């Protein structure tokens, strides 16, 4: 096993990351999220954000699954490895985080929904399962229907 992967502070020290740029991308993602939130008055302090005048603003980000889970890991204080390997969100899905200020000036994030596809269901549109391996081994690396392969995506 790789027990370090579960540790929010030490997952990058695992042997899997001794080469490559994941460490640099992780630090850039953390800094970018903190800089964005600072523009809204939220200053990172450990695993929470200090905010003198929290507002009910909405911030919308469009990003790839990998970066999204890195951002969520940073905001929730969990190793992104758990999210990368334990969650699946399809293209065009919606994930919603909210802030809570239980103590005046202390803001934390909570995930309200992850990978919501209700807009596709409402329009009777199919969703991709390409991010998943089959539930039972088939020799294929995708769960998308075979006819999607011939058409590019769908």
Name each model-derived stretch:
Residues 64:
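Short, conserved phosphate/pyrophosphate- and ester-handling motifs at nucleotide-, phospho-/glycolipid
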Residues 43, 47-58, 70-154:
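Acidic, low-complexity terminal tails and accessory targeting/binding regions
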Residues 1-40:
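Phosphate-handling substructures
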């Amino acid at each position: 096993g790789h027990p370090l992967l579960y540790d929010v502070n030490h997952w990058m020290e695992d042997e899997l990351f001794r080469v490559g740029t994941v460490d640099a991308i992780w630090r850039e993602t953390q800094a970018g999220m903190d800089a964005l939130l600072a523009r809204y008055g939220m200053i990172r302090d450990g695993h929470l954000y200090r905010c003198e005048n929290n507002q009910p603003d909405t911030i919308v980000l469009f990003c790839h699954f990998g970066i999204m889970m890195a951002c969520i890991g940073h905001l929730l204080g969990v190793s992104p490895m758990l999210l990368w390997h334990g969650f699946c969100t399809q293209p065009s899905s919606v994930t919603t985080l909210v802030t809570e200020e239980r103590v005046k000036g202390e803001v934390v994030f909570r995930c309200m929904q992850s990978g919501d596809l209700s807009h596709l269901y409402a329009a009777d549109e199919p969703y991709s399962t390409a991010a998943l391996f089959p539930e039972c081994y088939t020799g294929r690396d995708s769960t998308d229907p075979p006819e999607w392969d011939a058409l590019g995506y769908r």
